[in-house]
């Protein structure tokens, strides 16, 4: 029986929540990537196929990579011949003001996974972009071997492909990636109006995303976040994601300047009304 694939995790930007840092993309933390060196020393570089990372972790309420963190990962992977994979399911297609976060940060990974934004979320679809060397490794194998087996039941589903092509046309025709980049300073300033509001511990913004950490209640973690979600929906008519006692706000790329102000006005009212 083949040896099971093993996955090792090492400390990344999540550690930043344990220290006192500024909002936005942290200046401190690039050295956290050096933990990969320890993993390599422990297991050996020949046992590590790839490193996978989210350039901005959205499901943990917006954790941006510290400045220099992704560049350091790229350098270490190059040093040991390890593939670097960017999970851009959330960050791809304009969320950070570029087609992909790789472009924003100036780091070229070996593979990019994408989904969500490729169809603007209208139909489930995902895909992988690979460097030519990886592509060629599949395509230049023995003739009797399938180059890259991907003909699964829902692969290249016509509905998803049609939605993806339509979304890409709209992104191009309405220049939505550049629009998101232009709106980012306004989005940041609007989010920062919540700084100093009681129960707000930290605010993180990158692209058109914002994460707001709230102080937990003495009677349990997550209860304040849940109340915020309920109040947002029922009292203010706004929907946002909660992760424990953190709020994640990610508007559509067509959001207007006035709507940005309205969003954070409503979020502020929700937070101020919390028990």
Task: Please annotate each region the language model reported.
Residues 1-26, 30:
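Short N-terminal strand-loop motif that marks the start
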Residues 25-275:
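Conserved N-terminal phosphate-binding loop of PLP-dependent enzymes in the Aspartate aminotransferase
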């Amino acid at each position: 029986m083949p040896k099971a694939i093993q996955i090792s995790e090492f400390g990344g930007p999540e550690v930043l929540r344990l220290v006192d840092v500024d909002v936005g993309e942290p200046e401190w933390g690039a050295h956290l990537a050096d933990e990969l060196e320890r993993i390599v020393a422990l297991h050996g570089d020949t046992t590590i196929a790839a490193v996978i990372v989210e350039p901005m972790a959205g499901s943990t309420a917006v954790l941006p990579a510290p400045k220099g963190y992704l560049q350091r990962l790229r350098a270490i992977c190059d040093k040991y011949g390890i593939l670097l994979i960017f999970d851009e399911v959330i960050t791809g297609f304009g969320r950070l003001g570029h087609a992909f976060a790789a472009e924003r940060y100036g780091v070229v990974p070996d593979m990019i996974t994408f989904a969500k934004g490729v169809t603007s979320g209208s139909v489930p679809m995902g895909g992988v972009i690979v460097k030519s060397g990886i592509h060629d490794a599949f395509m230049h194998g023995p003739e009797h071997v399938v180059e890259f087996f991907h003909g699964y039941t829902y692969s290249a589903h016509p509905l998803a492909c049609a939605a993806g092509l339509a979304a890409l046309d709209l992104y191009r025709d309405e220049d939505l990636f550049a629009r998101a980049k232009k709106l980012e300073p306004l989005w940041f300033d609007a989010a920062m109006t919540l700084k100093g509001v009681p129960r707000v511990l930290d605010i993180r913004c990158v692209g058109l995303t914002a994460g707001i950490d709230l102080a937990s209640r003495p009677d349990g973690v997550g209860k304040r976040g849940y109340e915020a979600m309920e109040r947002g929906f029922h009292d203010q008519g706004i929907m946002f994601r909660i992760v424990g006692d953190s709020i994640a706000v990610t508007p559509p790329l067509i959001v207007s300047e006035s709507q940005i102000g309205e969003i954070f006005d409503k979020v502020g009212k929700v937070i101020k009304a919390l028990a």
